[in-house]
Regions:
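Auxiliary, metal-adjacent structural segments of Zn-dependent hydrolase domains
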Residues: 5-9, 23-103, 217-254, 488-494, ...
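Fold-level signature of zinc-dependent metallopeptidase catalytic domains
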Residues: 17-21, 107-110, 142, 148, ...
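Short pre-active-site segment immediately N-terminal to the catalytic Zn-binding motif
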Residues: 102-119, 272-278
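Non-catalytic terminal regions of proteins
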Residues: 103, 110, 114, 130, ...
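Well-ordered beta-sheet/strand-loop patches within structured domains
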Residues: 154-158, 171-254, 260-262, 326-422
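Long, internal scaffold/assembly segments composed of regular secondary structure
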Residues: 231-330, 334-335, 339
Length: 510
Protein backbone atom coordinates (compact mmCIF):
# COMPACT_ATOMS: atom_id res chain seq x y z
CA UNK A 1 0.00 0.00 0.00
CA UNK A 2 1.19 3.52 -0.71
CA UNK A 3 2.07 5.63 2.31
CA UNK A 4 1.65 9.38 2.73
CA UNK A 5 5.31 10.22 2.32
CA UNK A 6 6.54 7.44 0.04
CA UNK A 7 4.41 6.26 -2.90
CA UNK A 8 5.18 3.74 -5.60
CA UNK A 9 4.04 4.29 -9.17
CA UNK A 10 1.24 2.01 -10.34
CA UNK A 11 1.03 1.41 -14.08
CA UNK A 12 -2.74 0.78 -13.93
CA UNK A 13 -4.29 4.14 -14.73
CA UNK A 14 -7.93 5.10 -14.41
CA UNK A 15 -9.81 6.23 -17.49
CA UNK A 16 -9.70 10.00 -17.96
CA UNK A 17 -12.91 10.09 -19.99
CA UNK A 18 -13.93 12.81 -20.54
CA UNK A 19 -17.29 10.99 -20.46
CA UNK A 20 -18.18 9.13 -17.31
CA UNK A 21 -20.30 6.17 -16.29
CA UNK A 22 -21.62 5.18 -12.91
CA UNK A 23 -19.24 2.22 -12.85
CA UNK A 24 -16.31 4.57 -13.48
CA UNK A 25 -17.56 6.88 -10.72
CA UNK A 26 -17.51 3.91 -8.34
CA UNK A 27 -13.92 3.12 -9.29
CA UNK A 28 -12.79 6.70 -8.71
CA UNK A 29 -14.74 6.91 -5.47
CA UNK A 30 -13.07 3.74 -4.18
CA UNK A 31 -9.61 5.16 -4.94
CA UNK A 32 -10.45 8.52 -3.35
CA UNK A 33 -11.82 6.75 -0.29
CA UNK A 34 -8.64 4.68 0.04
CA UNK A 35 -6.43 7.77 -0.03
CA UNK A 36 -8.75 9.70 2.31
CA UNK A 37 -8.34 6.97 4.92
CA UNK A 38 -4.55 7.37 4.73
CA UNK A 39 -5.03 10.98 5.82
CA UNK A 40 -7.48 10.00 8.59
CA UNK A 41 -10.45 11.87 7.16
CA UNK A 42 -13.42 10.91 9.33
CA UNK A 43 -16.69 11.35 7.43
CA UNK A 44 -20.38 10.58 7.56
CA UNK A 45 -21.57 7.97 5.06
CA UNK A 46 -22.19 9.80 1.80
CA UNK A 47 -25.05 9.75 -0.68
CA UNK A 48 -24.17 10.99 -4.17
CA UNK A 49 -26.90 12.31 -6.47
CA UNK A 50 -26.16 13.17 -10.11
CA UNK A 51 -28.53 15.91 -11.30
CA UNK A 52 -29.13 18.20 -14.29
CA UNK A 53 -28.30 21.89 -14.45
CA UNK A 54 -31.98 22.78 -13.93
CA UNK A 55 -32.13 20.58 -10.84
CA UNK A 56 -28.95 22.28 -9.62
CA UNK A 57 -30.66 25.67 -10.02
CA UNK A 58 -33.60 24.32 -8.05
CA UNK A 59 -31.22 23.23 -5.30
CA UNK A 60 -29.70 26.74 -5.40
CA UNK A 61 -33.09 28.32 -4.90
CA UNK A 62 -33.92 26.20 -1.84
CA UNK A 63 -30.61 27.11 -0.14
CA UNK A 64 -29.11 23.78 -1.11
CA UNK A 65 -31.56 21.63 0.84
CA UNK A 66 -33.05 18.48 -0.72
CA UNK A 67 -36.50 19.43 0.54
CA UNK A 68 -38.02 22.64 1.85
CA UNK A 69 -41.30 24.31 2.68
CA UNK A 70 -43.02 26.41 -0.04
CA UNK A 71 -42.36 30.15 -0.24
CA UNK A 72 -42.27 32.62 -3.12
CA UNK A 73 -38.68 33.68 -2.34
CA UNK A 74 -37.39 30.27 -3.43
CA UNK A 75 -39.14 30.60 -6.79
CA UNK A 76 -37.79 34.11 -7.23
CA UNK A 77 -34.27 32.86 -6.58
CA UNK A 78 -34.76 30.06 -9.14
CA UNK A 79 -35.91 32.46 -11.88
CA UNK A 80 -33.05 34.86 -11.14
CA UNK A 81 -30.45 32.08 -11.25
CA UNK A 82 -31.94 30.58 -14.41
CA UNK A 83 -31.91 33.94 -16.22
CA UNK A 84 -28.30 34.71 -15.30
CA UNK A 85 -27.18 31.18 -16.19
CA UNK A 86 -28.86 31.17 -19.61
CA UNK A 87 -27.37 34.57 -20.46
CA UNK A 88 -23.90 33.42 -19.46
CA UNK A 89 -23.69 35.94 -16.60
CA UNK A 90 -23.42 33.32 -13.88
CA UNK A 91 -22.08 29.81 -13.71
CA UNK A 92 -23.38 27.01 -11.54
CA UNK A 93 -21.52 25.19 -8.82
CA UNK A 94 -20.16 21.84 -9.90
CA UNK A 95 -21.58 20.41 -6.68
CA UNK A 96 -23.70 21.16 -3.64
CA UNK A 97 -23.13 19.31 -0.38
CA UNK A 98 -25.52 19.10 2.56
CA UNK A 99 -24.65 18.76 6.23
CA UNK A 100 -26.71 15.65 6.90
CA UNK A 101 -26.17 12.04 7.92
CA UNK A 102 -25.73 10.50 5.40
CA UNK A 103 -24.00 13.50 3.80
CA UNK A 104 -25.76 14.28 0.50
CA UNK A 105 -23.65 15.53 -2.42
CA UNK A 106 -25.20 16.71 -5.70
CA UNK A 107 -23.00 16.43 -8.79
CA UNK A 108 -23.80 17.97 -12.19
CA UNK A 109 -24.30 15.37 -14.90
CA UNK A 110 -22.60 17.74 -17.39
CA UNK A 111 -19.28 17.35 -15.51
CA UNK A 112 -16.43 15.39 -17.05
CA UNK A 113 -15.03 12.44 -15.12
CA UNK A 114 -12.18 14.68 -13.94
CA UNK A 115 -14.62 17.18 -12.47
CA UNK A 116 -16.71 14.41 -10.93
CA UNK A 117 -13.61 13.03 -9.21
CA UNK A 118 -12.62 16.51 -8.03
CA UNK A 119 -16.10 17.15 -6.65
CA UNK A 120 -16.28 13.79 -4.88
CA UNK A 121 -12.95 14.48 -3.17
CA UNK A 122 -14.02 18.06 -2.39
CA UNK A 123 -17.55 17.40 -1.15
CA UNK A 124 -17.67 13.79 0.04
CA UNK A 125 -14.40 13.93 1.96
CA UNK A 126 -13.49 17.59 2.41
CA UNK A 127 -16.79 19.21 3.39
CA UNK A 128 -18.13 15.96 4.83
CA UNK A 129 -15.26 15.56 7.30
CA UNK A 130 -15.53 19.25 8.24
CA UNK A 131 -19.27 18.93 8.95
CA UNK A 132 -18.69 15.89 11.14
CA UNK A 133 -15.72 17.14 13.15
CA UNK A 134 -15.72 20.95 13.45
CA UNK A 135 -16.86 22.01 16.92
CA UNK A 136 -19.48 24.50 15.67
CA UNK A 137 -21.27 21.87 13.61
CA UNK A 138 -20.98 19.28 16.39
CA UNK A 139 -22.42 21.70 18.93
CA UNK A 140 -25.08 23.59 16.99
CA UNK A 141 -26.47 21.22 14.34
CA UNK A 142 -27.81 17.69 14.26
CA UNK A 143 -26.93 16.21 10.89
CA UNK A 144 -28.90 13.03 11.53
CA UNK A 145 -32.29 14.75 11.77
CA UNK A 146 -32.29 17.82 9.50
CA UNK A 147 -33.88 16.09 6.49
CA UNK A 148 -36.62 14.55 8.65
CA UNK A 149 -37.29 17.93 10.21
CA UNK A 150 -37.63 19.61 6.81
CA UNK A 151 -40.14 16.92 5.81
CA UNK A 152 -42.14 17.78 8.93
CA UNK A 153 -41.83 21.52 8.19
CA UNK A 154 -43.05 21.21 4.60
CA UNK A 155 -46.00 19.04 5.61
CA UNK A 156 -46.99 21.34 8.46
CA UNK A 157 -46.77 24.56 6.43
CA UNK A 158 -48.66 22.98 3.53
CA UNK A 159 -51.45 21.97 5.92
CA UNK A 160 -51.53 25.52 7.31
CA UNK A 161 -51.89 26.91 3.78
CA UNK A 162 -54.88 24.63 3.20
CA UNK A 163 -56.48 25.52 6.51
CA UNK A 164 -55.75 29.24 6.87
CA UNK A 165 -55.03 30.31 3.29
CA UNK A 166 -51.87 30.70 1.25
CA UNK A 167 -51.80 34.50 1.64
CA UNK A 168 -51.99 34.36 5.43
CA UNK A 169 -49.15 31.83 5.69
CA UNK A 170 -47.10 33.70 3.10
CA UNK A 171 -47.31 36.97 5.02
CA UNK A 172 -46.22 35.22 8.20
CA UNK A 173 -43.25 33.59 6.44
CA UNK A 174 -42.30 36.95 4.91
CA UNK A 175 -41.97 38.41 8.40
CA UNK A 176 -40.12 35.38 9.74
CA UNK A 177 -37.64 35.45 6.86
CA UNK A 178 -37.01 39.17 7.37
CA UNK A 179 -35.93 38.40 10.95
CA UNK A 180 -34.24 35.07 10.23
CA UNK A 181 -30.79 36.27 11.29
CA UNK A 182 -32.29 37.13 14.67
CA UNK A 183 -33.58 33.64 15.39
CA UNK A 184 -30.39 31.94 16.59
CA UNK A 185 -29.41 30.69 20.03
CA UNK A 186 -25.75 31.65 20.17
CA UNK A 187 -24.99 30.76 23.78
CA UNK A 188 -26.77 27.50 24.48
CA UNK A 189 -26.88 24.31 22.48
CA UNK A 190 -30.24 23.75 20.77
CA UNK A 191 -32.20 20.57 21.33
CA UNK A 192 -32.00 17.89 18.67
CA UNK A 193 -34.79 17.99 16.12
CA UNK A 194 -36.46 15.06 14.43
CA UNK A 195 -39.68 14.24 12.63
CA UNK A 196 -40.96 11.85 15.31
CA UNK A 197 -40.20 14.16 18.23
CA UNK A 198 -41.75 17.19 16.55
CA UNK A 199 -44.98 15.32 15.85
CA UNK A 200 -45.15 13.95 19.39
CA UNK A 201 -44.46 17.28 21.08
CA UNK A 202 -46.38 19.56 18.74
CA UNK A 203 -49.78 19.43 20.43
CA UNK A 204 -48.48 19.66 23.99
CA UNK A 205 -46.19 22.51 22.98
CA UNK A 206 -49.09 24.43 21.44
CA UNK A 207 -51.17 24.07 24.60
CA UNK A 208 -48.29 25.03 26.88
CA UNK A 209 -47.29 28.07 24.82
CA UNK A 210 -50.82 29.41 24.72
CA UNK A 211 -51.20 28.95 28.48
CA UNK A 212 -47.96 30.84 29.06
CA UNK A 213 -49.05 33.69 26.80
CA UNK A 214 -52.41 33.86 28.56
CA UNK A 215 -50.64 34.01 31.91
CA UNK A 216 -48.32 36.79 30.75
CA UNK A 217 -51.09 38.89 29.25
CA UNK A 218 -53.86 38.31 31.80
CA UNK A 219 -55.91 41.48 32.07
CA UNK A 220 -57.67 41.17 35.43
CA UNK A 221 -57.73 44.70 36.90
CA UNK A 222 -55.74 45.38 40.07
CA UNK A 223 -55.83 48.32 42.37
CA UNK A 224 -52.84 50.65 42.10
CA UNK A 225 -51.77 50.02 45.67
CA UNK A 226 -51.48 46.27 45.03
CA UNK A 227 -48.61 46.72 42.59
CA UNK A 228 -45.39 45.19 43.79
CA UNK A 229 -41.82 46.14 43.03
CA UNK A 230 -41.48 43.03 40.87
CA UNK A 231 -44.37 44.13 38.67
CA UNK A 232 -42.72 47.47 38.05
CA UNK A 233 -39.53 45.90 36.74
CA UNK A 234 -38.66 45.93 33.09
CA UNK A 235 -39.74 42.92 31.02
CA UNK A 236 -37.77 41.04 29.86
CA UNK A 237 -35.40 41.41 32.82
CA UNK A 238 -32.42 41.18 30.43
CA UNK A 239 -32.20 42.20 26.75
CA UNK A 240 -33.10 39.41 24.33
CA UNK A 241 -31.26 39.05 21.01
CA UNK A 242 -33.27 36.07 19.69
CA UNK A 243 -36.23 37.99 18.31
CA UNK A 244 -38.03 35.03 16.75
CA UNK A 245 -37.81 33.00 19.95
CA UNK A 246 -39.18 35.90 21.99
CA UNK A 247 -42.04 36.37 19.53
CA UNK A 248 -42.80 32.66 19.54
CA UNK A 249 -43.07 32.62 23.33
CA UNK A 250 -44.57 36.04 24.08
CA UNK A 251 -46.36 37.69 21.13
CA UNK A 252 -49.89 38.39 22.46
CA UNK A 253 -51.97 37.79 19.34
CA UNK A 254 -50.25 34.90 17.56
CA UNK A 255 -52.16 31.66 17.29
CA UNK A 256 -50.55 28.31 18.07
CA UNK A 257 -50.01 27.41 14.39
CA UNK A 258 -48.28 30.74 13.81
CA UNK A 259 -45.96 30.10 16.75
CA UNK A 260 -45.09 26.72 15.28
CA UNK A 261 -44.11 28.33 11.96
CA UNK A 262 -41.90 30.79 13.83
CA UNK A 263 -40.25 27.81 15.47
CA UNK A 264 -39.68 26.13 12.09
CA UNK A 265 -37.98 29.18 10.60
CA UNK A 266 -35.95 29.58 13.77
CA UNK A 267 -34.71 25.98 13.62
CA UNK A 268 -33.72 26.32 9.96
CA UNK A 269 -31.84 29.53 10.76
CA UNK A 270 -30.06 27.70 13.60
CA UNK A 271 -28.95 24.99 11.16
CA UNK A 272 -27.13 27.53 8.97
CA UNK A 273 -25.56 29.40 11.89
CA UNK A 274 -22.20 27.50 11.84
CA UNK A 275 -21.86 27.79 8.06
CA UNK A 276 -21.85 31.59 8.20
CA UNK A 277 -18.89 31.46 10.59
CA UNK A 278 -16.74 28.87 8.82
CA UNK A 279 -16.81 29.69 5.10
CA UNK A 280 -13.05 30.30 4.83
CA UNK A 281 -12.21 27.20 6.85
CA UNK A 282 -14.83 24.95 5.27
CA UNK A 283 -13.97 25.81 1.67
CA UNK A 284 -10.25 25.93 2.43
CA UNK A 285 -10.35 22.49 4.05
CA UNK A 286 -12.31 20.95 1.17
CA UNK A 287 -10.03 22.57 -1.42
CA UNK A 288 -6.90 21.44 0.43
CA UNK A 289 -8.10 17.83 0.44
CA UNK A 290 -9.27 17.63 -3.16
CA UNK A 291 -5.86 19.03 -4.13
CA UNK A 292 -3.97 16.64 -1.84
CA UNK A 293 -5.97 13.51 -2.68
CA UNK A 294 -5.85 13.93 -6.46
CA UNK A 295 -2.14 14.76 -6.38
CA UNK A 296 -1.63 11.63 -4.28
CA UNK A 297 -3.39 9.57 -6.96
CA UNK A 298 -1.20 11.15 -9.63
CA UNK A 299 1.96 10.39 -7.67
CA UNK A 300 0.81 6.78 -7.48
CA UNK A 301 0.29 6.73 -11.24
CA UNK A 302 -3.46 6.23 -10.93
CA UNK A 303 -4.51 9.23 -13.04
CA UNK A 304 -3.18 10.59 -16.33
CA UNK A 305 -1.50 13.86 -17.26
CA UNK A 306 -4.60 14.90 -19.18
CA UNK A 307 -6.67 14.33 -16.04
CA UNK A 308 -4.25 16.46 -14.01
CA UNK A 309 -4.16 19.30 -16.53
CA UNK A 310 -7.94 19.62 -16.46
CA UNK A 311 -7.99 19.32 -12.69
CA UNK A 312 -5.28 21.95 -12.17
CA UNK A 313 -6.98 24.34 -14.60
CA UNK A 314 -10.20 24.16 -12.57
CA UNK A 315 -8.40 24.28 -9.23
CA UNK A 316 -6.39 27.35 -10.24
CA UNK A 317 -9.56 29.20 -11.22
CA UNK A 318 -11.17 28.33 -7.88
CA UNK A 319 -8.29 29.67 -5.76
CA UNK A 320 -7.57 32.76 -7.88
CA UNK A 321 -7.56 35.98 -5.88
CA UNK A 322 -8.08 39.11 -8.03
CA UNK A 323 -6.02 42.12 -6.88
CA UNK A 324 -7.84 44.93 -5.09
CA UNK A 325 -7.77 47.18 -8.19
CA UNK A 326 -9.17 44.54 -10.54
CA UNK A 327 -12.69 45.03 -11.97
CA UNK A 328 -13.33 41.43 -10.86
CA UNK A 329 -12.43 42.08 -7.23
CA UNK A 330 -15.34 41.46 -4.87
CA UNK A 331 -13.53 40.85 -1.61
CA UNK A 332 -11.26 38.10 -0.35
CA UNK A 333 -11.89 34.74 -2.03
CA UNK A 334 -12.62 32.29 0.83
CA UNK A 335 -11.36 29.36 -1.28
CA UNK A 336 -8.07 31.16 -1.91
CA UNK A 337 -7.48 32.28 1.67
CA UNK A 338 -8.55 29.01 3.28
CA UNK A 339 -6.50 26.86 0.90
CA UNK A 340 -3.43 29.08 1.30
CA UNK A 341 -3.65 28.94 5.09
CA UNK A 342 -3.99 25.15 5.30
CA UNK A 343 -1.13 24.76 2.82
CA UNK A 344 0.91 27.16 4.90
CA UNK A 345 0.24 25.26 8.14
CA UNK A 346 1.56 22.13 6.44
CA UNK A 347 4.67 24.04 5.31
CA UNK A 348 5.27 25.46 8.79
CA UNK A 349 5.13 21.96 10.25
CA UNK A 350 7.37 20.36 7.62
CA UNK A 351 9.89 23.10 6.75
CA UNK A 352 9.70 25.95 9.26
CA UNK A 353 11.78 29.08 8.78
CA UNK A 354 13.15 31.18 11.63
CA UNK A 355 10.20 33.51 11.10
CA UNK A 356 7.79 30.59 11.45
CA UNK A 357 9.49 29.43 14.66
CA UNK A 358 9.07 32.91 16.12
CA UNK A 359 5.41 33.30 15.13
CA UNK A 360 4.28 29.68 15.63
CA UNK A 361 6.54 28.02 18.23
CA UNK A 362 3.84 25.49 19.15
CA UNK A 363 3.38 24.01 15.68
CA UNK A 364 6.69 24.65 13.87
CA UNK A 365 8.23 21.25 13.15
CA UNK A 366 5.24 19.30 14.53
CA UNK A 367 3.24 16.57 12.79
CA UNK A 368 1.47 18.39 9.96
CA UNK A 369 -1.50 16.05 9.69
CA UNK A 370 -2.26 16.19 13.40
CA UNK A 371 -1.94 19.98 13.38
CA UNK A 372 -4.28 20.35 10.41
CA UNK A 373 -6.93 18.20 12.07
CA UNK A 374 -6.56 20.24 15.27
CA UNK A 375 -7.02 23.50 13.36
CA UNK A 376 -10.07 22.14 11.54
CA UNK A 377 -11.76 20.79 14.67
CA UNK A 378 -11.39 23.59 17.16
CA UNK A 379 -11.63 26.92 15.32
CA UNK A 380 -13.98 29.13 13.32
CA UNK A 381 -12.97 31.70 10.69
CA UNK A 382 -12.37 34.51 13.16
CA UNK A 383 -10.19 32.51 15.57
CA UNK A 384 -8.56 30.48 12.76
CA UNK A 385 -7.25 33.64 11.08
CA UNK A 386 -6.25 35.17 14.40
CA UNK A 387 -4.29 32.04 15.31
CA UNK A 388 -2.80 30.79 12.04
CA UNK A 389 -2.50 33.64 9.52
CA UNK A 390 1.25 33.87 8.91
CA UNK A 391 3.41 36.74 7.62
CA UNK A 392 4.13 34.64 4.52
CA UNK A 393 0.44 34.41 3.59
CA UNK A 394 0.02 38.14 4.24
CA UNK A 395 2.92 38.85 1.88
CA UNK A 396 1.62 36.42 -0.74
CA UNK A 397 -1.79 38.12 -0.72
CA UNK A 398 -0.22 41.58 -0.38
CA UNK A 399 -2.63 42.47 2.38
CA UNK A 400 -2.99 46.00 3.69
CA UNK A 401 -5.58 47.68 5.87
CA UNK A 402 -7.65 50.75 5.04
CA UNK A 403 -8.93 52.78 7.97
CA UNK A 404 -12.26 54.43 7.13
CA UNK A 405 -13.14 56.65 10.08
CA UNK A 406 -16.48 58.45 9.70
CA UNK A 407 -15.10 61.34 11.78
CA UNK A 408 -12.48 62.12 9.12
CA UNK A 409 -12.88 63.06 5.45
CA UNK A 410 -10.02 60.85 4.27
CA UNK A 411 -8.95 57.19 4.16
CA UNK A 412 -5.77 55.99 5.83
CA UNK A 413 -3.57 53.01 4.95
CA UNK A 414 -2.94 52.00 8.54
CA UNK A 415 -0.86 48.84 7.97
CA UNK A 416 0.90 46.97 5.16
CA UNK A 417 2.47 43.52 4.97
CA UNK A 418 5.71 44.31 6.81
CA UNK A 419 7.09 43.79 10.32
CA UNK A 420 5.19 46.76 11.71
CA UNK A 421 1.88 45.80 10.13
CA UNK A 422 1.55 42.02 10.45
CA UNK A 423 -0.31 41.97 13.76
CA UNK A 424 -2.70 44.76 12.85
CA UNK A 425 -3.52 43.10 9.53
CA UNK A 426 -4.20 39.81 11.26
CA UNK A 427 -6.40 41.42 13.90
CA UNK A 428 -8.34 43.51 11.37
CA UNK A 429 -8.87 40.58 9.03
CA UNK A 430 -10.05 38.23 11.76
CA UNK A 431 -12.51 40.86 13.01
CA UNK A 432 -14.08 40.98 9.54
CA UNK A 433 -15.25 37.40 10.11
CA UNK A 434 -16.78 38.15 13.52
CA UNK A 435 -20.56 37.91 13.08
CA UNK A 436 -21.06 40.39 15.91
CA UNK A 437 -19.36 43.02 13.75
CA UNK A 438 -21.26 42.08 10.58
CA UNK A 439 -24.85 42.07 11.83
CA UNK A 440 -26.54 44.99 13.63
CA UNK A 441 -26.77 44.53 17.39
CA UNK A 442 -30.53 44.85 17.91
CA UNK A 443 -32.15 43.46 21.04
CA UNK A 444 -35.57 43.41 22.63
CA UNK A 445 -35.26 45.92 25.45
CA UNK A 446 -38.70 46.33 26.97
CA UNK A 447 -42.36 45.35 26.77
CA UNK A 448 -44.98 47.62 28.32
CA UNK A 449 -46.97 44.90 30.07
CA UNK A 450 -49.30 47.20 31.98
CA UNK A 451 -49.76 49.91 29.37
CA UNK A 452 -50.19 49.84 25.62
CA UNK A 453 -48.30 46.52 25.18
CA UNK A 454 -45.73 48.25 23.00
CA UNK A 455 -42.42 46.56 22.24
CA UNK A 456 -39.12 48.47 22.37
CA UNK A 457 -36.07 47.38 20.39
CA UNK A 458 -32.67 48.89 21.10
CA UNK A 459 -29.85 49.21 18.56
CA UNK A 460 -26.26 49.54 19.79
CA UNK A 461 -24.05 50.71 16.88
CA UNK A 462 -20.65 49.20 16.15
CA UNK A 463 -18.15 51.93 15.30
CA UNK A 464 -21.06 54.39 15.01
CA UNK A 465 -22.42 52.64 11.91
CA UNK A 466 -26.02 53.76 11.23
CA UNK A 467 -28.80 51.33 10.42
CA UNK A 468 -29.83 50.89 6.80
CA UNK A 469 -32.82 52.82 5.48
CA UNK A 470 -34.60 49.50 5.07
CA UNK A 471 -35.16 49.48 8.83
CA UNK A 472 -38.66 50.88 8.31
CA UNK A 473 -39.71 47.86 6.26
CA UNK A 474 -38.13 45.43 8.73
CA UNK A 475 -39.93 47.14 11.60
CA UNK A 476 -43.23 46.51 9.81
CA UNK A 477 -42.48 42.78 9.98
CA UNK A 478 -41.76 43.03 13.70
CA UNK A 479 -45.07 44.87 14.14
CA UNK A 480 -46.92 42.17 12.18
CA UNK A 481 -45.62 39.48 14.53
CA UNK A 482 -46.03 41.46 17.75
CA UNK A 483 -49.44 42.93 16.97
CA UNK A 484 -48.95 46.20 18.89
CA UNK A 485 -46.78 49.32 18.58
CA UNK A 486 -43.07 48.72 18.04
CA UNK A 487 -40.37 51.31 18.74
CA UNK A 488 -36.73 51.21 17.65
CA UNK A 489 -34.23 53.12 19.80
CA UNK A 490 -30.52 53.75 19.38
CA UNK A 491 -28.07 53.87 22.27
CA UNK A 492 -25.37 56.40 21.43
CA UNK A 493 -21.75 56.39 22.58
CA UNK A 494 -22.47 58.93 25.32
CA UNK A 495 -25.23 56.71 26.72
CA UNK A 496 -28.10 58.83 25.42
CA UNK A 497 -31.12 57.15 23.85
CA UNK A 498 -32.52 58.29 20.50
CA UNK A 499 -35.84 57.15 19.01
CA UNK A 500 -35.21 56.08 15.41
CA UNK A 501 -38.53 54.64 14.25
CA UNK A 502 -42.00 53.79 15.44
CA UNK A 503 -44.41 51.41 13.75
CA UNK A 504 -47.07 52.42 13.07
CA UNK A 505 -45.86 56.06 12.94
CA UNK A 506 -47.75 58.64 14.96
CA UNK A 507 -49.05 61.87 13.48
CA UNK A 508 -46.55 64.68 13.96
CA UNK A 509 -43.84 62.18 14.90
CA UNK A 510 -41.70 59.70 12.95
Amino acid sequence: MATIDSMNKDTTRLSDGPDWTFDLLDVYLAEIDRVAKLYRLDTYPHQIEVITSEQMMDAYSSVGMPINYPHWSFGKKFIETERLYKHGQQGLAYEIVINSNPCIAYLMEENTITMQALMMAHACYGHNSFFKNNYLFRSWTDASSIVDYLIFARKYITECEERYGVDEVERLLDSCHALMNYGVDRYKRPQKISLQEEKARQKSREEYLQSQVNMLWRTLPKREEEKTVAEARRYPSEPQENLLYFMEKNAPLLESWQREILRIVRKVSQYFYPQKQTQVMNEGWATFWHYTILNHLYDEGKVTERFMLEFLHSHTNVVFQPPYNSPWYSGINPYALGFAMFQDIKRICQSPTEEDKYWFPDIAGSDWLETLHFAMRDFKDESFISQFLSPKVMRDFRFFTVLDDDRHNYLEISAIHNEEGYREIRNRLSSQYNLSNLEPNIQIWNVDLRGDRSLTLRYIPHNRAPLDRGRKEVLKHVHRLWGFDVMLEQQNEDGSIELLERCPPRMGNL
